[in-house]
């Protein structure tokens, strides 16, 4: 039973950590959609290795 509580506790802690941590700058957005995606965040669009990167203006 204590293993079940440990698993539930780990899942809850992981969920809280993922909620608190801000999203990483590299998003799963294609380079074609990058300018529109970054414009919604009021940031500058840049493509790195075919991945969209939003940078502060």
Curated annotation (Swiss-Prot):
Q: Where is the signal peptide?
A: 1-19
Keywords on record: Disulfide bond, Ion channel impairing toxin, Neurotoxin, Potassium channel impairing toxin, Secreted, Signal, Toxin, Voltage-gated potassium channel impairing toxin
Subcellular location(s) of the protein: Secreted
UniProt GO cellular component terms: extracellular region
Q: Name one Pfam family in it.
A: Toxin_6
Does the entry feature the keyword Coiled coil, yes or no?
Answer: no
Expressed in which tissues:
Expressed by the venom gland.
Q: What does this protein do?
A: Voltage-gated potassium channel antagonist. Has a high potency on Kv1.3/KCNA3, and is moderately active on Kv1.1/KCNA1 (35% peak current inhibition at 3 uM of toxin) and on Shaker IR potassium channels (70% peak current inhibition at 3 uM of toxin).
What's the further remark here? Answer: Negative results: does not inhibit rKv1.1/KCNA1, rKv1.2/KCNA2, rKv1.4/KCNA4, rKv1.5/KCNA5, rKv1.6/KCNA6, hKv11.1/KCNH2 (when tested at 3 uM).
The record's domain comment reads: Has the structural arrangement of an alpha-helix connected to a beta-sheet by disulfide bonds (CSalpha/beta).
Q: What is this protein called?
A: Potassium channel toxin alpha-KTx 8.6
